[in-house]
C-alpha cells in the first residue's frame, strides 16, 4: 500500500 507518516 502507500501512505505518509511523519514524526518530529
Swiss-Prot record:
Question: Which UniProt keyword terms apply here?
Answer: Amidation, Neuropeptide, Secreted
UniProt-annotated location(s): Secreted
**A cellular component annotation (GO) from this entry:** extracellular region
Q: Which residues carry this modification: Glycine amide?
A: 8
- Asked whether the UniProt record includes Secreted among its keywords, one would answer yes
Q: Which top-rank group of organisms is this from? A: Eukaryota
Q: Which residues form the signal peptide?
A: none
Example GO biological process: neuropeptide signaling pathway
Annotated function: This cephalomyotropic peptide stimulates contractile activity of cockroach protodeum (hindgut).
**Protein name per the record:** Leucokinin-5
**Originating species:** Rhyparobia maderae (Madeira cockroach)
Amino acid at each position: 500500500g502507500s501512505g505518509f507518516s511523519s514524526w518530529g
